């Protein structure tokens, strides 16, 4: 152990340097967000919990084309189409999404020709059981009704880039 090393050790040079760095950051504003009480703004392109949308007259948008089911890489979407109606259109009888399988890629939303299936703004949907992550048509429509205003605004903001 040399004299220089002994002097540095005795004067605690490294400790003093570390203390200066600590004090420098101590008085700066905190970059951390206090999460449950404060939330950062979400991008209009955010992909969260799925929702099925309705037209303003209350009719569901989904035309049972099954493009979302075909394009889903995780095979998380299951659709059963009902019989053709008098006007020649079809509607879904069953629309299920297995959120355990879903990878939130957004391909279902891009494939939909009528903007029926969208990924909404909600990212807080933790559950206690796996069964709660199997979304049926009623739950997806309820999500769409709950967030319709925000979803429509996000689609409008994203329209120039689509």
Swiss-Prot record:
Topology term for the membrane: Peripheral membrane protein
Domain of life: Bacteria
InterPro entries recorded: 4Fe4S_Fe-S-bd, 4Fe4S_Fe_S_CS, NADH_quinone_OxRdtase_chainI
PROSITE patterns reported for this sequence: 4FE4S_FER_1, 4FE4S_FER_2
Domain (4Fe-4S ferredoxin-type): residue spans on this chain: 52-82, 93-122
Binding site for [4Fe-4S] cluster 1: 62, 65, 68, 112
Record flagged with keyword Transcription regulation: no
Positions with a binding annotation for [4Fe-4S] cluster 2: 72, 102, 105, 108
Location of the protein in the cell: Cell inner membrane
Keywords for the protein's UniProt record, in alphabetical order: 4Fe-4S, Cell inner membrane, Cell membrane, Iron, Iron-sulfur, Membrane, Metal-binding, NAD, Quinone, Repeat, Translocase, Ubiquinone
Cofactor note: Binds 2 [4Fe-4S] clusters per subunit.
EC number(s) on file: 7.1.1.-
Chain's role: NDH-1 shuttles electrons from NADH, via FMN and iron-sulfur (Fe-S) centers, to quinones in the respiratory chain. The immediate electron acceptor for the enzyme in this species is believed to be ubiquinone. Couples the redox reaction to proton translocation (for every two electrons transferred, four hydrogen ions are translocated across the cytoplasmic membrane), and thus conserves the redox energy in a proton gradient.
Subunit architecture: NDH-1 is composed of 14 different subunits. Subunits NuoA, H, J, K, L, M, N constitute the membrane sector of the complex.
Identification of the protein by name: NADH-quinone oxidoreductase subunit I
Lineage: Bacteria, Pseudomonadati, Pseudomonadota, Alphaproteobacteria, Hyphomicrobiales
